[in-house]
Amino acid sequence: MKPFMDADFLLQTDTAKTLYHEAAEKMPIFDYHNHLNPQEILEDRQMENLTRVWLGGDHYKWRAMRAMGFSEDLITGNADDYDKYLAFAETIENAIGNPLYHWTHLELQRYFGITTPLSRAAAKEIWDEANAKLQTKEFTVRNLILDQHVSHLCTTDDPVDDLHCHLALQKEDFACRVLPSFRPDRAVHLEKPDFPEYVEKLAAAAGRTIASAEDMVHALSCRLDFFLSAGCVVSDHSLEGCFYVPCTAAEANDVFEKRMNGGVLTEKELGMYKGFLLTNLGRLYHKHNIAMQLHIKALRNNSKRMFRALGADTGFDSMNDFAFAPMLGTFLNDMDEDDALPKTVLYSLNPGDNPMLASMAGNFAAPGIRSKVQFGTAWWFNDHKYGMESQLATLSSIGMLSTFIGMLTDSRSFLSFPRHEYFRRILCNQIGNWVENGEYPANLEFLKEMVENISYNNAVSYFL
């Protein structure tokens, strides 16, 4: 029997161990997509206890706790922090096979030096030891980031945000670069009830009137210029349902006017407006050399009762299953026809789309850019061991694993950076298996460089 999560965790061959310990383990982290709060980084917040740092905004954990039957008061409610923690400890003890189990114990080991498995029986001992350390200066938010050798992290930000935290951090002596990401979902999703109110906010932020779809593009262009001044290198879009129908500017303007006048839009009209906005934004991204991330197929807020009670992003989303390959191909080609396709990263929440996305990415290339269109890492419901292995196998079978930009946390927790370690161990194990099965030569120096590139260097080259 192998020891529980020891130094060779998930590394099944000698080659895998060599690649991880001599290459992947030492590389810094470029976390190009997360949902961390930049205000907490600026303030260098000291987390009060494990409950605050673990359960403050993590819907992965909330879903698992609900599956255990705990009351909402112990999950997102006003219950005592220690009682919430005990409920989480019991949840983790029962979470065999779930990535939360491995993530939680990697966090305990890497940040706190705690190797005792979390359970209700061990909860008090772990609570006391971890909380004592959380009160020291070594465990402020900035030090948690530096502890994991994070060189860059990209937060997720709305075009109307003033980015005061990012701008202030630029003036401070903080070794990690905290960069904004441009996420204009609220400008794109005109079917949302608050779209008219958002148009007013965007107009105020951009300092210009918005009376048409073309005006929306101009306003977003103004805000993108501001984001670029704060170091933005990447955008992000959540695409749900029909997101592209070719149309003229006049047709997109008509759809915008209809929506602002209270009209009910057809699916085709939604696709026309969204496609017009997205292709124009894509051309702007290409002009400014920033990457475009497309996160596709989240089916959000399925429990309307809980959405009314708690709002969005609280653990009631799941995978969608609509077909979108022709639409995606036409959308990307629209920009490529003018040689205006930006670097693009494709993700689907439904793993059934993996072969399609990997093959789609190979349709669009450019001299001097390694894998200009990337098949993105296993996302959300897929960022577990099996999901990562599947994504790596699909990418290597259809595309080029060696040019892959690697992992991200997609997290709201400052303890989540060991997820990069989890990915790197799985990556090294996959490559190690190929080598020791005689499927690839044991050229360890070459392979170590490849692992270093996938772990960090490729992302630096791609985004910076």
PLM features: what roles do these ranges have?
Residues 331-337:
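Short, basic/hydrophobic alpha-helical segments
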Residues 266-267, 316-322:
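A short acidic, glycine-rich active-site loop
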Residues 298, 303:
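Hard-cation-handling environments
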Residues 307-315:
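Short glycine/proline- and charge-enriched loop/turn segments
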Residues 292-294:
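C-terminal amphipathic alpha-helical interaction region
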Residues 324-328:
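Divalent-cation-assisted or electrostatically stabilized phosphate/pyrophosphate-binding catalytic cores
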Residues 1-288, 340-342, 346-358, 362-464:
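Metal-cofactor-binding active-site regions of metalloenzymes
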